[in-house]
Amino acid sequence: MSTHADSKPWTVPALAEAKRNGQKLVMLTAYDAGFARTFDANGVDLILIGDSLGMVVQGHDSTLPVTVADMVYHTRAVARVLQRALLVADLPFGADATPERALDASLQLLQAGAEMVKIEGAGFKVDIIRYLVEREIPVCAHLGLTPQSVLRLGGFKIQGRGDAARQLVEDARAVAAAGASIMVLECVPTPVAAEVTAAVEVPTIGIGAGPQCDGQVLVLHDFLGLDSGHRRPKFVKDFLAEGGSVAGATRAYADAVRDGSFPDEQHAYAS
């Protein structure tokens, strides 16, 4: 099985090739140059500037207060040091409310160094994704638990159970057809995430979505066992405890994702 060379910078087309080759993708969030440099040098394939920074960096109770300016600042800091990992940046809450707003925010993020933008949800967002892709902006979709929908959802809850599973699969097909290059599946039962992964040609990146996704992502503070001021989800594992250092934890996480040992049943939702 051919795999992406460790020293070769990641590109958007290489992500789909990785899925075809059965190569697991390793993703982490980062918000500054120091952590990003360490992750980049120790096996991380994609780095996400997540609007999770609103909770773990800024101290908010949700991601809703994060602005485009916040995202641009952190994107610039991370982009300066990356040599290998592909850089993805979130469109924050409200920035993708219309095609024009999404385009403006996306251009700012790409000019700051991002190589892809992430959009939460389906529905009218499918047309937003298509609009951006038609304008040469790579997009990462995000389905399942979408933190920007926390008010509507009534909290951070598992998605895709029961009748909602079929809708999730349909949404995945829709965002893939619209041109999304990859998609994050968050807090989705393992069997449903496996069905989505089999239904689409683009790579799926799981976070609380079981081991059958094409890759995994964790929030920096969670995978290092740091206190972010919020309850730790079931799917989180403290890799610093076994890695002994940030670099060691990163290598341990990357190895566990690639060999399929993470996530195990303890760190996933069976139903």
Curated annotation (Swiss-Prot):
Binding site for Mg(2+): D51, D90, E120
UniProt entry keywords in alphabetical sequence: Cytoplasm, Magnesium, Metal-binding, Pantothenate biosynthesis, Transferase
GO CC entries: cytoplasm
Enzyme class: transferase
Active site: E186
Main location: cytoplasm
Binding site for 3-methyl-2-oxobutanoate: D51, S52, D90, K118
Cross-referenced PANTHER family: 3-METHYL-2-OXOBUTANOATE HYDROXYMETHYLTRANSFERASE
Function: Catalyzes the reversible reaction in which hydroxymethyl group from 5,10-methylenetetrahydrofolate is transferred onto alpha-ketoisovalerate to form ketopantoate.
HAMAP family in the cross-refs: PanB
Subunit structure: Homodecamer; pentamer of dimers.
Name listed for the protein in its UniProt record: 3-methyl-2-oxobutanoate hydroxymethyltransferase
Organism: Stenotrophomonas maltophilia (strain K279a)
Source lineage: Bacteria, Pseudomonadati, Pseudomonadota, Gammaproteobacteria, Lysobacterales
